[in-house]
């Protein structure tokens, strides 16, 4: 996102921040390896080096203030007066934001938030948590909504075994449920289809597969992954989730 500004409710404090997606290799490292590396590291530079090896920029890795799930908060500023006094509030806001993102109150993953600058009131009483947490969330929300966020959905990677003569019918069942075929092979008289299917579409799949393959087809789970929901389903799904949660029945905007 471009650099955006968040203002405190009392108008005495301003934060300049930006939001961008984390590279897939870094995100995967944060998900699968970061906690173990941090737990076993004798020195902090070992964690830094592991992040750089995963693909993070040197300067970003040097200035991480917080890692939360698969998201990072980076201090990209050049010396902000009184930053230490408000840092705890900024990081609390960051974690709350990541736990309930602005699209539909769902968790956010793969996010890098950068703090570029801050203008803070001289008197500490005017830059407490009730001022700085909303300010931080305001800036992050503006940046997030300008960074082309997408709703992602869980999918299951499956192995489908079917007699070769009913393979086409099995593939039809997969495609009818927004599934994608990854690979096909033959093992003796059987065909093996490796595919991925949205979890939402799996209800009734086993019965449908049995019906399409004369009772001989079956599937097994390989892995669970997350991928962006198709563009044409994004808005309606977001609105449906917002309705279920009692949120405003409209897409989030910068003006909120």
Where are these regions (language model features)?
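Accessory interaction regions appended to the cores of large information-processing enzymes
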Residues: 1-256
